[in-house]
Amino acid sequence: MDRNLARAVADKQPVPEIDFTLHVMEDGTQVSTLERVVKEVQAPALNKPSDDQFWDPEEPTKPNLQFLKQHFYREGRLTEDQALWIIQAGTQILKSEPNLLEMDAPITVCGDVHGQYYDLMKLFEVGGDPAETRYLFLGDYVDRGYFSIECVLYLWALKIWYPNTLWLLRGNHECRHLTDYFTFKLECKHKYSERIYEACIESFCALPLAAVMNKQFLCIHGGLSPELHTLEDIKSIDRFREPPTHGLMCDILWADPLEDFGQEKTGDYFIHNSVRGCSYFFSYPAACAFLEKNNLLSVIRAHEAQDAGYRMYRKTRTTGFPSVMTIFSAPNYLDVYNNKAAVLKYENNVMNIRQFNCTPHPYWLPNFMDVFTWSLPFVGEKITDMLIAILNTCSKEELEDETPSTISPAEPSPPMPMDTVDTESTEFKRRAIKNKILAIGRLSRVFQVLREESERVTELKTAAGGRLPAGTLMLGAEGIKQAITNFEDARKVDLQNERLPPSHDEVVRRSEEERRIALDRAQHEADNDTGLATVARRISMKIPSTTRR
């Protein structure tokens, strides 16, 4: 045998050298591990800009717009002082503006952006260079999308450059309550700090509430209010605060036209907005009465996703012009709506709608989680399942062969006083093995709860159960696309996220209660898993008896 061993060692083949700089893909393609596989996608900008890069070379008191545009496009971040300067400088300009802006045509009107920075860049391609084009944005720059702070910083930088040709109104998401509930606060803390978030909240309170365009159109984010009789009512609002949950300021940000606008079955001008959980639905007669009283042509608003990016409502009897128009400028909203976006260009008394589609963008896991936080519950559940499968070494016949036991198979053995325990005894070892196996079963159920929570952490949730169909997120983007097939499906599924959210304390309370119920259910299922209990008992009984000498 020694001779064979020596011969095997002498004839041992050398370990082949592996070139780890090359990787063979599933289709046989060789790619370099030292380069980006998808070369047309730029690498993220890892370095924060110097002051020379940040400030414009020709206007050293203003940020370099071209640099910011490309830097944000590559997911770059600014220093905290640079970001804070943009927000605070923009805030000072916004504070100087009245509640009700007035501007003339030509102008391009834009709806919700919702943190879709890459689509915002497409918007400027379609609408025109801000250096040469007048813009009015109707609010909702943040939340839901994962590039909200980039949208704020770039739009505020544009406001610094073009204070008299680019205007920003407030949307219902520009407030502390919604940004805390959705994604913007988390995004600010992840990419910058809470200091940047607080500066943004202060700036949001300075945003004007409405605009009159060309003395013909009232432009607002939400809609009309029973407290809005004349334009003077808007001028008297104290806007420098968190929006209230009722009243004129709330309605300007939250109200919607009735779903059957123009074909109402009620004579009421305003009814409670059951979809939003606050404010009102306003009717066609209410819109016509307001327009006629204020000598206006139409109300231009945003606030609602539209399949085509816009919607023209019923025309008024006196002017033949749409009484209300909705503009929505976030294409493929939440990456599942499959909607077009639109901007409204008004020039020489001619109104044109320009539509555009979504632009590819980098992917973020829900709530800015890293891959380990996201995947650990999935991995943990599978590992514990594998461990239970390994422990289950008994045949079907063995499991059916009941072993006498004085303790219920569904319950772990009760602890024994340590001063009376013989740790070398067979009974002690059997109890320990049995309890450990049952603990693994409970751990498996806990990981299942955590995995379900990970699946549920998505911006698009079903009204039934608060999440997409089980397993959808494990299937990736294709699974989501199959679950949500069209715009109307997505809109119905997402209705609960269009409501005024509950308070922070209520959200925490509900979350803790849901987790407690889920963990109790997991504990109950584990304790009543007769198969696992039988395996635990059978394995523990295989420990040989020990005899004392």
UniProtKB/Swiss-Prot annotation:
Which class of enzymes does this protein belong to?
A: hydrolase
Q: Required co-factor? A: Fe(3+); Zn(2+)
List of catalytic residues = H173
> A GO CC term?
cytoplasm
Disordered: annotated span: 399-421
Q: Which GO terms describe its biological process?
A: calcineurin-mediated signaling; cellular response to calcium ion; fungal-type cell wall organization; G1/S transition of mitotic cell cycle; negative regulation of calcium ion import across plasma membrane; positive regulation of mitotic actomyosin contractile ring contraction; positive regulation of mitotic division septum assembly; regulation of cell morphogenesis
> Which parts of the sequence bind Fe cation?
D112, H114, D140
Q: Which GO terms describe its molecular function?
A: calcium-dependent protein serine/threonine phosphatase activity; calmodulin binding; calmodulin-dependent protein phosphatase activity; metal ion binding
Matching SUPFAM superfamilies: Metallo-dependent phosphatases
* CDD domains hit by this protein: MPP_PP2B
User: Which domain of life does the UniProt lineage start with?
Assistant: Eukaryota
Q: Which UniProt keywords apply?
A: Calmodulin-binding, Hydrolase, Iron, Metal-binding, Protein phosphatase, Zinc
PROSITE patterns recorded for this chain?
SER_THR_PHOSPHATASE
Reactions performed catalytically: O-phospho-L-seryl-[protein] + H2O = L-seryl-[protein] + phosphate; O-phospho-L-threonyl-[protein] + H2O = L-threonyl-[protein] + phosphate
Give me the residues that bind Zn(2+), please: D140, N172, H221, H303
| This enzyme's EC code(s) | 3.1.3.16
Q: How is the cofactor bound?
A: Binds 1 Fe(3+) ion per subunit. Binds 1 zinc ion per subunit.
Q: Give the disulfide map.
A: none
Q: Which InterPro entries match?
A: Calcineurin-like_PHP_ApaH, Metallo-depent_PP-like, MPP_PP2B, PP2B, Ser/Thr-sp_prot-phosphatase
Complexes and interactors:
Composed of two components (A and B), the A component is the catalytic subunit and the B component confers calcium sensitivity.
Family statement drawn from the similarity comment of this UniProt entry: Belongs to the PPP phosphatase family. PP-2B subfamily.
Report the protein's function. Calcium-dependent, calmodulin-stimulated protein phosphatase. This subunit may have a role in the calmodulin activation of calcineurin.
Q: Could you identify this protein by its name?
A: Serine/threonine-protein phosphatase 2B catalytic subunit
